[in-house]
Amino acid sequence: MSTTVLFEHPLNEKMRTWLRIEFLLKQLSASQIIVDHQGALTFFRNAGELLDVFERGELRTEILKELERQQQKLLSWAEVPGVDMTQIEMHRAKLKGCATSLIAAPRMGQLLREERLISLVRQRLSIPGGCCSFDLPTLHIWLHIEQQLRDQQVAVWLDSLAPIRDALMLLLALIRQSGILRTHTSLNGFFQDNAEGADLLRLQLRLEDALYPQVSGHKSRYAIRFLPLDSERGEVPARFNFELACC
């Protein structure tokens, strides 16, 4: 069992959206083997929420810009003496490949939008108990077809998300790796600092302290207040060490 807990907090709307997409993609992957009604509703609810997020802003454009920005960062690293050029070229090739795939891909989530079953379930999810067999006979019979056929259909849906998934996972990995966890000290449960040019805060706390961070901030500055998990009897130490990475 882990003795630490890692928290992440976005410092801009772009990163907030990306983290939500990552969360939903992971939920879809974890629930892709659908064997019953409960599992189906979990999958379709996540699919519907993902399509809702896809509707917000210039998502593809922002990701393509970040892919280009990360390539430029790698080029600047190439000028550092002793740097591993093999790693730099490998990452640049991955970034270029993701950009090419994303440019060539249709509208994000288009296959899921056009899938009649997903559309039917999505319409009923907002109604309390609205996904009973008499409400959605299509889903009811789909859950009784052979498991292999159902798995194949779900796999096709998820494969259609590969361009956005691969690009986003690579970008988030590079962004997370750009910051190193360092020890800091909060005074009376409070800490603040500058975050010029950063997209993401990562905080690692000891589980035994039973504290969690409440973060407020934007692209230039942030503040963290630590609160006890037990709001009635818990206490926050006057001085409290934690690890923080500004990415």
Swiss-Prot record:
Cell cycle recorded as keyword: yes
Subcellular location: Cytoplasm
Major location category of this protein: cytoplasm
GO cellular component term, pick one: cytoplasm
Highest taxon of source: Bacteria
One record GO biological process: FtsZ-dependent cytokinesis
Keywords from the named record: Cell cycle, Cell division, Cytoplasm, Septation
Matches recorded under InterPro entries: ZapD, ZapD_C, ZapD_sf
Protein family (similarity comment): Belongs to the ZapD family.
Function: Cell division factor that enhances FtsZ-ring assembly. Directly interacts with FtsZ and promotes bundling of FtsZ protofilaments, with a reduction in FtsZ GTPase activity.
Subunit structure: Interacts with FtsZ.
Protein name: Cell division protein ZapD
Organism: Erwinia tasmaniensis (strain DSM 17950 / CFBP 7177 / CIP 109463 / NCPPB 4357 / Et1/99)
Taxonomic lineage from the root: Bacteria, Pseudomonadati, Pseudomonadota, Gammaproteobacteria, Enterobacterales
